[in-house]
C-alpha cells in the first residue's frame, strides 16, 4: 500500500473542501488516514485459501454453523463503512476448518473496498473451493453508512444478502435447517 500517495490525496481533499490543512486538528490527519487504511484494507494482501488450507479430518459430515461473526468493511462506491454480522453454515466433505478460520475468511473479504453482495458470494465460494465443502450457506446482515449519512439518509436500515452453494442450494430441507440454526 502506498501510504505516501494516500497522505497526499487526503491533504488535497482537506484543501479541496475548504479547510486549512495546517490547522492543529488536521495537521496529522493525512498520516492518520493512511495508517487507518492499512488496517481497514489489510485483506488486500491475503487469501482465504491460506486460512482454510489447514483443516481437520472428521468421521461424519454434519452441518457446521458459526453465527454472529461481526465484521466491518468499506463500501467501494462511497468509501464509507458498512458493518454487521455474518452467519455461515457448511456441510463438510470429510474435513472441517478451525472455527477461527471461518472468522478469518470473513475478514479477508471484508477488509478491502467491497460491496455486500460480493462479500457474501466470496465467503460461500471460498468454503466450496478451499475447504471442499459439500454445501455452503452465507447470510450477511449489515448497516451501510452510505445509506445512513448521505443520499436517502435512513439510519438503522439493514441489508440482508445470502449465497447458497452445493447441497445447501439444492436440498430445501437442509437449507431450511441451516436457516433455522442461524436463527432465521
UniProtKB/Swiss-Prot annotation:
Pfam families: GTP_cyclohydroI. The keyword GTP-binding applies. Transmembrane segments: none annotated. One of its GO terms (cellular component) is cytoplasm. Zn(2+) binds at residues 75, 78, 146. One of its GO terms (biological process) is tetrahydrobiopterin biosynthetic process. Its EC number is 3.5.4.16. The keyword Magnesium does not apply. GO terms for molecular function: GTP binding; GTP cyclohydrolase I activity; zinc ion binding. Pathway: Cofactor biosynthesis; 7,8-dihydroneopterin triphosphate biosynthesis; 7,8-dihydroneopterin triphosphate from GTP: step 1/1. Gene3D superfamilies: 1.10.286.10, 3.30.1130.10. It comes from the Bacteria. It catalyses: GTP + H2O = 7,8-dihydroneopterin 3'-triphosphate + formate + H(+). Keywords: GTP-binding, Hydrolase, Metal-binding, Nucleotide-binding, One-carbon metabolism, Zinc. HAMAP family: FolE. Belongs to the GTP cyclohydrolase I family. Toroid-shaped homodecamer, composed of two pentamers of five dimers. This is GTP cyclohydrolase 1. The gene is folE.
